[in-house]
UniProtKB/Swiss-Prot annotation:
High-level lineage: Bacteria, Pseudomonadati, Verrucomicrobiota, Verrucomicrobiia, Verrucomicrobiales
Main localization of the protein described in the UniProt heading: cytoplasm
Annotated gene: dapB
One Pfam family matching this protein: DapB_C
NCBIfam families tied to this protein: dapB
EC number from the UniProt entry: 1.17.1.8
Name this protein carries in UniProt: 4-hydroxy-tetrahydrodipicolinate reductase
Stored HAMAP family: DapB
Catalysed conversion reaction: (S)-2,3,4,5-tetrahydrodipicolinate + NAD(+) + H2O = (2S,4S)-4-hydroxy-2,3,4,5-tetrahydrodipicolinate + NADH + H(+); (S)-2,3,4,5-tetrahydrodipicolinate + NADP(+) + H2O = (2S,4S)-4-hydroxy-2,3,4,5-tetrahydrodipicolinate + NADPH + H(+)
UniProt: (S)-2,3,4,5-tetrahydrodipicolinate binding residues: 133, 142-143
Length: 246
């Protein structure tokens, strides 16, 4: 049985992760951690850590995980470029699954988006829309950013130059190479994501809607189990699910 450290235990996702770990017959909660608590004692007694806390905690977690040779599943979003680079650097020493979304359905959306972009992208106007609950603190969501990165790569565009975050005022006709990004917040929406490919005469929409955080939590536990025995490296949920081989 794999012993798992759950960080950010007081948060919504921390609670969901704890429940998912408890429900899985192959895992147990070895320890939990929250802001202000010492990390080493909690990490030392576990086989792997699942982190859905806050991006500002990532540097501390990475340092302790590397020092103690512990695999990590990182689901926190909103990282700065420096923090993302720290994750890449740490993956040279330990195996890390780093994903913006651990839902199996969302990762199918990632795969489908890449394929659709390869078929349609060059001739379509592309827009990404996401909606989350009123308490979410970052925008756009990590999942929406991943979708835009997938789209940019699939149609050979630069993310920074192509993505436009919302529109206001007299912006003029839509440039063909734009990828529009739109964030909505309200209510208790767990997470909705839509990719739109619009051309003259037709429109393709790919949509995923999550109704429970348990879908993310169960995917993160699946990733933690998959990490056991892996070589150091930076992995994604597409690796965990085998989608990168399709």
């Amino acid at each position: 049985m794999i012993s798992i450290l759950v960080t950010g235990i007081s948060g919504r996702m921390g609670q969901a992760i704890q429940e998912a770990v408890t429900q899985n017959p192959d895992t147990c909660v070895g320890s939990t951690h929250d802001q202000g608590q010492e990390l080493y004692p909690a990490l030392a007694k576990c086989d792997v850590a699942i982190d859905f806390s806050h991006h500002a905690f990532t540097s501390t977690l990475l340092a302790e995980a590397v020092a103690n040779n512990k695999p990590l599943v990182i689901g926190t979003t909103g990282h700065t470029e420096l923090e993302r680079q720290e994750i890449v650097d740490a993956a040279a020493s330990i195996p890390i699954v780093f994903a913006s979304n651990y839902s199996v359905g969302v990762n199918a959306l990632f795969w489908l988006t890449r394929k659709a972009a390869q078929i349609l992208g060059g001739s379509c106007d592309i827009e990404v829309m996401e909606m989350h609950h009123r308490h979410k603190i970052d925008a756009p969501s990590g999942t929406a950013r991943t979708l835009a990165e997938i789209l940019s790569g699939a149609i050979d565009r630069n993310y920074e130059d192509s993505v436009v975050f919302g529109r206001e005022g007299l912006v003029g006709p839509r440039p063909a190479k734009e990828i529009g990004m739109h964030s909505l917040r309200g209510g208790d929406v767990v997470g909705d994501h839509t990719v739109i490919f619009a051309s003259d005469g037709e429109r393709l929409e790919l949509t995923h809607k999550a109704s429970s955080r348990m879908t993310f939590a169960s995917g993160a536990v699946r990733a933690a189990l998959w990490l056991q025995g892996r070589e150091p490296g930076l992995y994604t949920m597409e690796d965990v699910l085998g989608l990168s081989q399709l």
